[in-house]
Amino acid sequence: TKKKDEWKNALMPWVTRSGQDNTIKDTYSEATGYSQNYRLRETSPSDKRNLGDIIDSSVLTVGGGQTTDGLVDGRNEFLVTAANDGMVHLFQSKNDTHPYSLKLSYIPGGMERDASYGGKNIAETLKEVAHEKYGRDASHPHRYLINGGIVVRRTAEDVEAGIIGQQSFLFGTMGQGARGAYALNIGGKGRITGKAVGLN
C-alpha cells in the first residue's frame, strides 16, 4: 500500500464494518494518497446483507443436543457458515426475538493462494474485495476466498467417566479460495473443569 496505516485505518474497518463506508471512501482514497478507492455497500434498512456471497459452503447448526433439552427456543445453539468475504461466520442463538446473532467472524488470513488468482494469501486479497470496482470488470473479478466444505461435530458427554462438558467444533477447507484447512472450537464446556469455552 502507499500508506502504512491503510490496513489499520481503512481496510480493517471496511472488512469488519466497524467504520462507515462513506467515511472510508471519502477519507482513504487514491486522491488522499491511499492505494485504492473503497467500495460502498448497500446501507438501506431493508437490505440486511452483511455477509459475502456463500457459494458451495454449507450453513450448519450444532450444539444443544438432539432433543429439546439444551436447545435455545427449539434451536441448536450455534449456526456457522463460510463466505467469499474471506470470513467464517459464527452465530449464537439467545432468544426468540433474535434467533441468531453474529458473534465472531474468523479470517484465516495467512492461508496461501495461487498468486494468479489474486493476492498471495487471504489477507492480501481482502483489499481486492473492498475495491470500488470489485466484481464489475475483468480487471476486478469476483474472488473465491472461502467456499470449501465445512463440518461441525459435538463431543460426547460421559458424566460417569468424569467428562462433564461437551464442546462444539467446526472443521473447514478453503475450497477455491486457498490451500489449507482450519478448525475452530466454537463453544461448550471444558471436558475436565466444566468451565465455559469458546463463544460460551
Predicted regions and their residues:
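A fold-level detector for beta-propeller and closely related beta-sheet-rich head/sensor domains
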Residues: 1-200
